[in-house]
From Swiss-Prot:
ISGylated. This is L-lactate dehydrogenase A chain. It catalyses: (S)-lactate + NAD(+) = pyruvate + NADH + H(+). GO terms for biological process: lactate metabolic process; pyruvate metabolic process. There is a cross-link at K57 (Glycyl lysine isopeptide (Lys-Gly) (interchain with G-Cter in SUMO2)). It comes from Monodelphis domestica.
């Protein structure tokens, strides 16, 4: 008598078990796990790998997700602190790093997180040399540059989550103000993910109707409706959430899954994400900033050339200068 399995199943094919749509999430903190569950619930991967340095937490998070397998369509969920577990990933999401404290600027995290990246990036490259890297850790624009430098990857394959979330926050707040669902409220926030981000008021519209054409003072200091406060709220929102609950997680997780979907399904949707923008808007340094990018299976294939006002362009340039000032001091 064979085992129950032998009696039940006749094997007719010896299969090679290589994944075709594998995604890795590095870092299983609040952000990493929000990314993981959001990716799982969008059915984007046939294998999900989790990596972290805290082994008990890592195993616990993996088991907790595995126990939900019946309700998911991702047949393999694995984890290890050994990067061999990440082999053959199509997409690697990096959320590992020091967490922003209450009132702390994202830029303040930089050297701590650079040191962490020096260990992570070479390991990812070793096991998934053809993957796309999606950097989420803050300060995201600088760390995307760091990941690009450390990986040796072409710039199309190194992507920062950038202003995808800032723009989503903006569209939510705009929707609240107008009583319209955020998917029908269009507006782009570009530049640094953080305090010096730039709202492009000229492009803000509903159904193609420019709000600036209806209300020329939109976004200026002389605006009686104070639309500028909408952008101010976007900038302050992360700080407020951190103050209230200690960290942000759900919105960034959903934002990352949105980007992962465009990559894994080769959707070629346009997202405000961090890419190398040297040569645009009079920027001559290797700076990563958010501009609208076409995102698909090869990562960022194209950049949309946005018409900016003189003020918007100078604010973008200022953002770039701030970031370059920090980047050039970094110890690799």
């Amino acid at each position: 008598m064979g085992t129950v399995k032998d009696q039940l199943i006749l094997n007719v094919l010896k299969e090679e078990q290589t994944p075709h749509n594998k995604i890795t999430v590095v870092g299983v903190g609040a952000v990493g796990m929000a990314c993981a569950i959001s990716i799982l619930m969008k059915d984007l991967a046939d294998e999900l790998a989790l990596v972290d340095v805290i082994e008990d937490k890592l195993k616990g998070e993996m088991m907790d997700l595995q126990h939900g397998s019946l309700f998911l369509k991702t047949p393999k969920i694995v984890s290890s602190k050994d990067y061999a577990v990440t082999a053959n990933s199509k997409l690697v999401v990096i959320t590992a790093g020091a967490r922003q404290q209450e009132g702390e600027s994202r830029l303040n995290l930089v050297q701590r997180n650079v040191n962490i990246f020096k260990f992570i990036i070479p390991n990812i490259v070793k096991y998934s040399p053809n993957c796309k890297l999606l950097v989420v850790s803050n300060p995201v624009d600088i760390l995307t540059y760091v990941a690009w430098k450390l990986s040796g990857f072409p710039k199309n394959r190194v992507i920062g989550s950038g202003c995808n979330l800032d723009s989503a926050r903006f569209r939510y707040l705009m929707g609240e103000k107008l009583g319209i669902h955020s998917s029908s409220c269009h507006g782009w926030i570009l530049g640094e993910h953080g305090d010096s981000s730039v709202p492009v008021w000229s492009g803000v519209n509903v159904a193609g109707v420019s709000l600036k054409s209806l209300h020329p003072a939109l976004g200026t200091d002389s605006d009686s409706e104070q639309w500028k406060d909408v952008h101010k709220q976007v900038v302050e929102s992360a700080y407020e959430v951190i103050k209230l609950k200690g960290y942000t997680s759900w919105a960034i997780g959903l934002s990352v899954a949105d980007l992962a979907e465009s990559i894994m399904k080769n959707l070629r949707r346009v997202h405000p994400i961090s890419t190398m923008i040297k040569g645009l808007y009079g920027i001559n340094e290797d700076v990563f900033l958010s501009v609208p990018c076409i995102l698909g299976q090869n990562g960022i294939s194209d950049v949309v050339k946005v018409t900016l006002t003189t003020e918007e362009e100078s604010r973008l340039k200022q953002s770039a200068d701030t970031l370059w000032g920090i980047q050039k001091e970094l110890q690799f």
